[in-house]
Amino acid sequence: LLKVINSEIMIYNHSFIGDKTDYLSKDYFGMSACGGEIKGDKLSAFNIGDSNILVLDKFYNILYRTKDDIRLLSNIREEEIRKRVPYITDSIDEHWNNDKEFRVWFRKEYINTDNEFAYGSLNGNEKALEHINYYEWYVKNAKYILAYTGGFEEVLKNENNIVKLIKAKKFKPKINGTLIGFIKE
């Protein structure tokens, strides 16, 4: 299924920008993703990029959490970037927002590559499939399964926030994010 999704994204990208990207104005559309299927007491799941899954029991204890390659490697990646790009001495984010050459270099170096600090994005590139993480979890004791994007990462580190979200109280992350919940009966 993920191969099909990834190839459909490539067809979309080719129809809009052609066969070549400049990693800037003609950059490929890409996305992070997560999903899964429950059969019996087993959840088969996957994630790529900063889309994640959190599995909780009825007391809101974390049973399982997917690996967020973007966040996990971000500090190491920043150190590596500072070594390789000497003119960066301040925030990487500042350069991302204001330095086109840096954005081009970063995308070529760190998205869907063999670089040990790279992360995946479903953008049609075959390499994206190598960055997908797969999981098999026993979920007999699971009650809540949350699928979310990076905007909710910090929110979901706090148990009180998790309880508020599950009980459908109003809660807004500091940055944009998507949250989908499932209650297992």
Residue spans for each PLM region:
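PP2C/PPM-type serine/threonine phosphatase catalytic domain
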Residues: 1-185
